From Swiss-Prot:
Residues binding FAD: G8, G9, G10, H11, A12, G13, I120, S175, Q362
Gene designation per UniProt: mnmG
Gene Ontology CC: one annotated term: cytoplasm
UniProt source species: Neorickettsia sennetsu (strain ATCC VR-367 / Miyayama)
GO biological process, one term: tRNA wobble uridine modification
Entry keyword set: Cytoplasm, FAD, Flavoprotein, NAD, tRNA processing
HAMAP family the UniProt entry points to: MnmG_GidA
Function: NAD-binding protein involved in the addition of a carboxymethylaminomethyl (cmnm) group at the wobble position (U34) of certain tRNAs, forming tRNA-cmnm(5)s(2)U34.
SUPFAM superfamilies: FAD/NAD(P)-binding domain (SSF51905)
Keyword tRNA processing attributed: yes
Predominant place of localization: cytoplasm
Official protein name in the record: tRNA uridine 5-carboxymethylaminomethyl modification enzyme MnmG
Family the UniProt entry places it in: Belongs to the MnmG family.
Needed cofactors: FAD
Length: 627
């Protein structure tokens, strides 16, 4: 009989346990504290650029996160809305209490899922096969598979200035016994992350801040929801200043992360100490003041995580506009913890060393709630025997897992970005259900209700698309309509052809074919996005094939990687350090993504690089859309 044990009740553990239970397998979720299931340990928000796509992918496969945030969303925004849909990033601020309540309520509806409050101290491994786990209070628990989603708890050390305590999170003890067990079986390294202080709301001078309202109406994350019913509130923006930076610079010798903590933190979510040192030329850094809940007295100051002593935290916080009289409810800290080398995992997230043992979340070297959830749904599904593998072309979850198991983390927490995906034109936040719901349904992750909703949406979309392809007119007829300009080439054009053009909007089609007014607003946007991207998706596939044929392209010794705007600072830093001689060498550098290689190839081709093969006609123009 199958019996899956999930260790840890964070975002990875929640999705792993829910996925296993949805597949009809008896599942046990073991957590240190039932009331902390779904806890947002750091910022009270879900989503963002790249991250929001993962949440939509988890939802497309029947997951929990999107449903939970829709019940707790108090401030919703679509990031990058002014850019192409491929880089849109849905994001929502959460009411912490509402989010945890929603997660727990959703989990309790699974008949096959039980929850146990205990500390897992050991693993039972025989002949390189997991046979069970050992609980501090429960003792031996036999199982067919287990998923480790321990977050920052493995040998966690919390530091604020010179204060150093063992802990997996504020107020919770670390998992030392389990951490020591893993050290006997796996290659273990250390990472760190941090969190800022929490401030009392009534001590903040909001008149000195810039208000940032959310989108109206707020857009749900889940494909199963049509609206957000939770009251909405604003966030606020302020900035550090010269005085703030001076206080921090003069106090670096007291910072834990500058003195003694050797583990590396997240590159793209640096502490304020790192910002002041790494970006010394900057006069200020932006801070978002995010409410922790509708009835919470606390505010999360996003952008000033640190490990400075408490008195220095108060001093630099009060040097910031609007925070001159700020009262600290809880001080910032950094936490150092164990993680495994994810290159020792299969694409199912099963260990190569120990059969039936799966890993998901920060234990794999990632950072972020969303990355954890994406790994959790894959690990939990496969622990239950689903055989679920998501490819790089199917989802950001596939990009992330492939990056982890082939490249590793390069010693720093892994964060997902749209730039990591060579297929990003298709991996959009608007089409995750079209990409993954059918696949998830086939393995049993998606129930009949969700699948029926997906099929209705899919069929409706394609019916409307067919109608747009059937309707056609001539440039001559279009010229008679005021405000519509099109080349008089004599070629008959369908409504679908017209909407592919950037200057055409769906409302223009209504002036030509009034009968299209029956198309609902959400389908108008879907049709427009798909029409605009369709020609480039075909060329994107050509681009990926071309890349495989250009691995021997020579990279000049004086090539300026920094001139390629689409490359991240992380990738540029690694390329400059190694100075690869060919594209093949560049591909083997840990952290240099396939998307980055594509960008390099484009620029090399324009320079007439030695060994590069000719691009198909018009491909240069198409590839520019990827950068």
């Amino acid at each position: 009989m199958q019996y899956v044990v999930v260790i840890g009740g964070g975002h990875a553990g929640v999705e792993a346990a829910a996925a296993s239970a949805r597949l009809g397998v008896e599942t046990l979720l073991v957590t240190n504290n039932v009331m902390n299931i779904g806890e947002m340990s750091c910022n009270p928000a879900i989503g963002g650029i790249g991250k929001g796509n993962v949440v939509k992918e988890v939802d497309a496969m029947g997951g929990v996160m999107a449903l939970a945030i829709d019940r707790a969303s108090i401030h919703s925004r679509m990031l990058n809305r002014s850019k192409g849909a491929a880089v849109w990033g849905p994001r929502a601020q959460a009411d912490r209490k509402l989010y945890k309540c929603a997660v727990l309520e959703l989990l309790t509806k699974y008949e096959k899922l039980s929850i146990l409050e205990d500390h897992i101290t050991d693993l039972i491994i025989e002949n390189d096969r997991l046979m069970g786990v050992v609980g501090e209070k429960t003792g031996t628990i036999k199982c067919s598979a287990a998923v480790l989603t321990t977050g920052t708890f493995l040998n966690g050390i919390i530091q604020t200035g010179s204060e150093r305590v063992e802990g997996g999170r504020f107020g919770e003890k670390a998992s030392q016994c389990l951490g020591n067990t893993l050290r006997r079986h796996f290659k273990i390294s250390r990472l760190r992350t941090g969190t800022p202080a929490r401030l009392y709301k009534d001590s903040i001078n909001y008149s000195a801040l810039v208000e940032q309202p959310g989108d109206s109406p707020p857009i749900p994350f889940s494909y199963m929801n049509t609206e957000i019913t939770v009251p909405q509130v604003s966030c606020y923006i302020t900035h550090t200043n010269g005085k703030t930076h001076e206080i921090i610079r003069n106090s670096l010798k007291f910072s834990a992360i500058r003195n003694g903590v050797s583990a590396r933190g997240p590159r793209y979510c640096p502490s304020i100490e790192d910002k002041v040192v790494r970006f010394a030329e900057k006069d200020s850094h932006q801070i978002f003041l995010e409410p922790e809940g509708l009835d919470s007295e606390l505010v999360y100051p996003n952008g000033i995580s640190n490990s400075l002593p408490k008195e220095i935290q108060e001093e630099f916080i009060r040097s910031i506009a609007g925070l001159e009289k700020a009262s600290v409810a809880r001080y910032a800290y950094t936490i150092e913890y164990d993680y495994i080398d994810p290159r020792e995992l299969r694409s199912t997230l099963e260990s190569k060393r120990v059969k039936n043992l799966y890993f998901a979340g920060q234990i794999n070297g990632t950072t972020g709630y969303e990355e954890a959830a994406g790994q959790g749904i894959v690990a939990g599904s496969n622990a239950a025997g689903a055989g679920l593998i998501i490819s790089r072309s199917e989802g950001y979850i596939g990009v992330m897992i492939d990056d982890l198991i082939t490249l590793g983390t390069n010693g720093e927490p892994y964060r997902l970005f749209t730039s990591r995906a060579e297929y990003r034109l298709n991996l959009r936040s608007d089409n995750a259900d079209f990409r993954l719901t059918e696949k998830a349904y086939r393995v049993g992750l998606v129930d009949e209700e969700r699948y029926a909703a997906y099929k209705k949406k899919y069929d409706t979309f394609h019916n409307y698309k067919s109608k747009l392809n059937e309707l056609s007119t001539t440039p001559y007829e279009l010229a008679k309509i005021e405000g519509i300009s099109i080349a008089q080439d004599g070629v008959r054009k369908s409504a679908w052809n017209l909407i592919t053009q950037p200057l055409f909007v769906f409302e223009d089609l209504l002036r030509i074919w009034p009968e299209l007014s029956e198309v609902p607003e959400k389908y108008r946007e879907m049709l427009t996005i798909n029409a605009r991207y369709e020609p480039y998706l075909l060329r994107q596939e050509q681009d990926v094939k071309l890349l495989r044929n250009n691995e021997k392209v020579v990279i000049p010794s004086n090539f300026d990687f920094g001139a390629i705007k689409s490359l991240s600072s992380e990738v540029i830093e690694k390329l400059e350090a190694v100075r690869p001689e060919t594209l093949a060498q560049a591909k083997r550098i840990s952290g240099v993504t396939p998307a980055a290689i594509v960008s390099i190839l484009i620029h090399l081709r324009r320079l007439g690089a030695e060994g590069s093969q000719p691009f198909p006609k018009d491909l240069d123009q198409a590839l520019r859309q990827l950068n």
